[in-house]
């Protein structure tokens, strides 16, 4: 079942990591509660989603409570991850609503001494060019939202990556860095993005589960 698959994925991550630093998982509490418990104090970086899957405008998991008070129960070494589907061309009303939700969650993370990861995927909300992701990032900074981590789609040009890095470094010298998401893309396409991103120290790693194990998981 899906719960056993989550446990197997965690076992694989722990086996590969061994005693080395720099490995981690993304795991939600609805399907992966046992894996989250097991991952505690293992040294793995643990990102835990807070969004209601697929929501646009953004909605947060009801389990967090109306004031996100349940975050006080999260272990301090878990990173609060939220995915916001947004695009520079979104109308004012949509931006306002999504900004309000993201800012409330960001502030709740600060109150509870939890790191905050903001994931944005503009390509799922409209056409993109080399400035699109950078403009989205700037929009959140303009609203005094300073994520500890950014999770960004695999950009394919030097210009797009340079614009993103400039936007982050211009606004926040203390951000932890960037994690690249996979979107289920081919290894070839991700490799092209990684080869560019590897030139920037701000890019810390990637989370591309479907590309790595989707076929195996389906067969299993």
Ranges and model annotations:
Residues 29-33, 50-54, 84-88, 120-124, ...:
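Active-site-proximal loop/turn and secondary-structure-junction residues that shape catalytic pockets
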Residues 17-67:
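Active-site cofactor/substrate anionic-group-binding motifs, chiefly glycine-
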Residues 23-26, 47, 77-86:
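N-terminal substrate-binding region of glycoside hydrolase catalytic domains
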Residues 119, 150, 209:
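Conserved, mostly hydrophobic/aromatic
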Residues 8-17, 39, 64-79, 94-95, ...:
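Alpha/beta enzyme core
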Residues 2-3:
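Short, small-residue-biased leader/transition segments that mark boundaries at the very start
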Residues 153-220:
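Catalytic-face loop-and-helix region of soluble metabolic enzyme cores
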């Amino acid at each position: 079942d899906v719960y056993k698959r989550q446990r197997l994925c965690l076992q694989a991550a722990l086996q590969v990591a061994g005693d080395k630093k720099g490995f981690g998982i993304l795991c939600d509490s609805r399907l992966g509660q046992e894996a989250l418990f097991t991952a505690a104090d293992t040294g793995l970086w643990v990102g835990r989603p807070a969004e209601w899957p697929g929501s646009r405008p953004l909605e947060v998991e009801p389990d967090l409570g109306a004031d996100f008070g349940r975050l006080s129960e999260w272990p301090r070494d878990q990173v609060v991850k939220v995915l916001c589907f947004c695009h520079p061309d979104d109308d004012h009303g949509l931006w306002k609503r999504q900004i309000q939700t993201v800012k409330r969650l960001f502030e709740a993370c600060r109150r509870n001494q939890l790191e905050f990861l903001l994931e944005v995927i503009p390509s799922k909300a409209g056409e993109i060019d080399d400035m699109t992701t950078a403009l989205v990032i700037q929009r959140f900074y303009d609203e005094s939202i300073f994520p500890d981590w950014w999770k960004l789609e695999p950009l394919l040009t030097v210009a797009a990556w340079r614009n993103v890095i400039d936007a982050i470094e211009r606004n926040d010298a203390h951000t932890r860095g960037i994690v690249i998401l996979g979107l289920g893309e081919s290894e070839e396409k991700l490799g092209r993005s990684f080869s560019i991103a590897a030139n920037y120290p701000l890019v810390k790693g990637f989370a591309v589960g479907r590309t790595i194990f989707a076929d195996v998981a389906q067969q299993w």
